[in-house]
Amino acid sequence: MAFLRCEIASESLRMATAVDVILPDQGELSRIKTLYLLHGLTDDCTGWTRYTAVERYARERGIAVVLPEVQRSFYTDMVYGLSYFTYVSEELPAVCRRMFGLGAARKQNYIFGLSMGGYGAMKCALTYPDRYAGAASFSGVSDLRCTIAHRSLSLQETEITAIFGEKKAVPPKDDLFVLAERLSGDAPGIYLSCGEQDGLYAANERFSAHLASLGIAHRFEHWPGAHSWDFWDASLRAALAYFFD
């Protein structure tokens, strides 16, 4: 495997930004599967490689892994800030295909994330279901509207304003429940997990029930666990097995 730490000039962000990439050293890159792996609110693009065995898991399956950096943006095109959703969902895949020759076919592309990144992964997959074969959310912020209303995140008021504007309201385009209702065509495969001692467990139960009520096939797995890297490493293994084995 090759591990690349890159700084790319992003047009949508109007600045240089970090992205880590794990590439197999065998096989034609245009034919392999690519996993976009998203970080959480208090991490950066190095978290997954520092605290899990993602490179080993990628080697075992011969897949590429792309780990972008989005700061504390909640994977949104911020009202007062940068266009991180556009970057992750549109610009970054195009850059990876141009620079590394990764495949563009839906069947080759997957997106996973933890916590804030779990929200981001679901948002990308539900907004653009034709681009991803599968998506996974681990301890995801699935009910963002409720979470923001109850100030259940370690976001400052100024950060919430920067992301969503003065009203601090989550618009429909950023609400996973609404995006699921608007889903048309074939849904990507969906995998959800959450620890039973996690403060986000009830929200993930609600989201799973909502998907079920809409007839959207998915798997929701839960077991004793907290909002922790131990749980996310286990979830990553489970999701990789679900989609790739």
Language-model-derived ranges and their functions:
Residues 1-245:
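Non-catalytic cap/lid and distal C-terminal segments of serine-dependent acyl enzymes
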